[in-house]
């Protein structure tokens, strides 16, 4: 900063620059000094300290002044200092010096760089020069300044980087690469890009043209590991063996304990040792031959005990395998891959490629490279009732082996027997055909069933009193097995599956079964019938049945059992047809009276031989069972479980009649129970009163005794005149007590007489009331019977008055009119409704006459008097029945 002062005091080791404005030349004034500024001069800045370079330091000055040989500063003709423009000067430790005008302190005071041991400076020449030894250095040359030492910088030299030595430890190597052609520290010539390893332990300082790639660790080898290497190029390894590019080899602990991979070696991995025990073996694929090359496509079997390393290119087939140790019940199925001979001397056996043979234990077997183990076979233990299916692969025949332990030969395999899905499901259910026959088919087991072993002989336990039919499709014949028995299927045999009807009413194919139960058993069916007067009823019938087999050893006789696949549905349909035909010829009233006899006669029929009656007329005798000759089914009895009207109005009328009878019976029983309760209450009350009187009598007796004792005591205590007075008083008390006792007895007798009289009176009253109530009920029943009879007669007369033809005309008038209307429209077909919408002629007559639903055909039964089949009125319900007659009461649900 310029100053305007005229007197400037310059301290020691300071300086200023003075500009002569006339000549425009600057000069240096150095202190200590007092400088008087002239008018034509200008001080450019205040006094400034000189540049002091301490020892072991340096600074860089740009545009330095020129000096002569003696070191004096040179000036030009104008008095201006002569500068070396665009040049640099490095000044080391010296006396303090000022900066002349034009000089610039480019780099401030800087300590000299100390190069430590194992360290070097990478230097590069910027200009040509000669070093202190007189050697010429060309710009671009590079070299190292290695420590220890202090580096004195030069303006012609640039410090590129600081290089640190790399420490090489045991089992390590330094990988280097030449940046250009050079000589390494061992005196070997290296070309550009060449790589090599330095294995000398210690600190290694790379040369100027050596590039450190990485520090390579040695691979420690043990007896159980080997190093897998591959050559990157042709070279000689550390053992002096020539390696070609791509060649692979192993280095084991026998070669070296620690191996440092060379720069021309590629580490593919560490190979573990393969150890075989005394019962192990392995198959090596593509084994290495004596020439060290892999024999492609070859195999070698190695048996333990042995340890080895897999050579490059070798691999194990299925790893380490166990030697086959076979017992007496084991064997091996072998196949020859190549022609070979087995055995020794005379026992040699030749096998061609593809041959199969079986060896049996006990022995230890190691398959050779020419033999393939197809499978290991185990003898199959079979119980007396167990078996397997075996197929000969040469002939194709299948047979069943049952009851003994068996091992398949080389030409045999297990054969799987397929069963129809229905049979498979029935076998897997595991249900007892007899005990579980009532369970529904929809009740499935929650736990999944284990799949059947298809190679095992299919067996089925036939329960007692049952039969199973098995059909042989090869022999084209069937056999029937009766239980209890265990039936086993041959290779070509199948079960005959029964598809039975079930439910109420019976539904076809609702239940499937393998065995046929021979009975006795029962099944129930619901059928709908229609009487001659068009009354529709629903019957629930139960039939007891069984199968009759005269000779179980006769094949034709036993085959009849399975001639009808659905004997339940067939029998129910046949019986229902007979019942419908029999009921269709009788009226509702007759059927209601004799339902059991009619149904039994319809089901069983009559004997063919007719007996003669007393008057010489033929009397057919009813049968006691129905026989179906197709399959020998016998229906031994019929149970009519329920009879229900299908028509709602008929059902309501019957229900009201039954309710009325129930109410009458209930009221009668209620009155009798009430009378009995009152009688028991009167008896209990009389006994209670009698007990009270007896208790009072006993109390009086005790009081009498007490008074006697008191009197006696008074008599003992008193003497003289007091004795007489006491005796008189005691006598009076005795007389009074006897009077009280007598009075109590009389009262008790009077009360008993009154109670007995009252009881007799009440009993007479109750008997009269019961007679009166019974008479009233009989009058009401008689009235109801007479009304029903009148209604029946009225309905009968109306029906007779109208006539059957008129009723028929009324019934078909509507459909005929509809048919004519359809014909007028040109239609050629007529729709006939099914049984769900029948023509009810029974109610049509009442509708035509304008009568209500009260006109039910009940009068006929009343008019005919109480009968054994009557189930509506109370009198008929209590009437005795004839022997052998069945009484059927309609059940309303």
From Swiss-Prot:
Q: What's any one GO cellular component for it? A: membrane
Q: Is the keyword Repeat assigned to this protein?
A: yes
Q: Which terms under GO biological process does the entry name?
A: cell population proliferation; ERBB signaling pathway; mRNA transport; negative regulation of epidermal growth factor receptor signaling pathway; negative regulation of protein autophosphorylation; negative regulation of protein tyrosine kinase activity; protein activation cascade; protein transport
Q: Which residues carry this modification: Phosphoserine?
A: 445
InterPro entries, per the entry: Band_7/SPFH_dom_sf, MVP, MVP_rep_dom, MVP_rep_sf, MVP_shoulder, Vault_2, Vault_2_sf, Vault_3
Q: Which Gene3D superfamilies match?
A: 2.30.30.560, 2.30.30.570, 2.30.30.620, 6.10.250.720, 6.20.380.10, Band 7 domain, Major Vault Protein repeat
The protein depicted here goes by the name: Major vault protein
Q: Which UniProt keywords apply?
A: Acetylation, Cytoplasm, Isopeptide bond, mRNA transport, Nuclear pore complex, Nucleus, Phosphoprotein, Protein transport, Repeat, Ribonucleoprotein, Translocation, Transport, Ubl conjugation
